Amino acid sequence: MNGLNQLQKYIKEQELTGVVLIDPINLHYFAGFTGTTGFAIVTQDKAFMITDFRYTEQATKQCEGYEVIQYETSVMDTLVDIFNDNHIHNGLFGIEGKYMPVDTYETLCDTLDERFNFTSINFAKLRAVKREDELELMRKAAKIGDDAFAALLPQLKVGMTENDARIILESEMLKRGSEEPSFATIVASGNRSSMPHGVASDKIIEDGDFITFDFGAVYKGFHSDMTRTVVMGPASEQQKNLYSIVLEAQKRGVAAVRAGITGKELDAVCRDYIRERGYTKEFNHGTGHGVGLEIHEEPVANPKSDTVFSENMIITVEPGIYLSGEIGLRIEDSVIVKADGCELLTHSPKELIEIGI
């Protein structure tokens, strides 16, 4: 089942007249469109992609099952023409309430008068369970990240900056087919490792530093996400102790992933283990999130998440400990939820790596 079939099945199940899409992520997922200007109308049995001259040919090639319509001056006028030409005169349409700007919504309402009602749909939930073709692309993205990280490790040297390491890592991903980094690459060393999202800086990497790398590749639009923490030279007893706690919590989290578990149940597996070893406030972010066409998607694993995981969802498992201004670390894998467990997407070694030893 492709994105369009999935969406039309949903429209019928929800007894909607149709949906209106403008979010580039949803246009990619449900139509295959990767241009920057598009507007899709999908009904129970028809689909239209509205775009301008720059993307008409592209949309014709990408948007299987859609009638591609080029607008000249006004998207809204073209929308009205589509409705009139196809005898769509009233009904209930789903819109992207979390994405659609207020002015666009108001224009949509004004343009269509009072003929239609609108309801907000969380399309991210529709994208949460991945199709097999998506999973294959995500396996490829994850492998790019794994291979790039393996290529980085022998190049790490005391005296280089975090940005030097970032450039090497991102270059290795690009060499292997990544379109771009999944997000601003995190390289946090020494006392900066206590910052969960410490993006790479010009800090010099020193002997004895923990270095946390949180990064990902993008392959055909799909993201990977992985975190590993290494130490420059021999690890101290404190580093070994903290690392062993986080590693065990992370392994327990991965082992707990399965269809039927909730986000807060998974979170508790990691959080309780860390708390029982004396660290509560030092682990103060969620345990995981979904990944796909966006780096942060449904589902989530945090203390408040009642989301029940389904087979073929993606979830990260990424506990950490952060001692403010001193030291920190995180270990993260992305996994595919299965009926009785999970499939690892990321395979880089998780035992503590001492660089240069």
Predicted regions and their residues:
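Active-site neighborhoods and metal-handling regions in enzymes and metal-associated proteins
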Residues: M1-I357
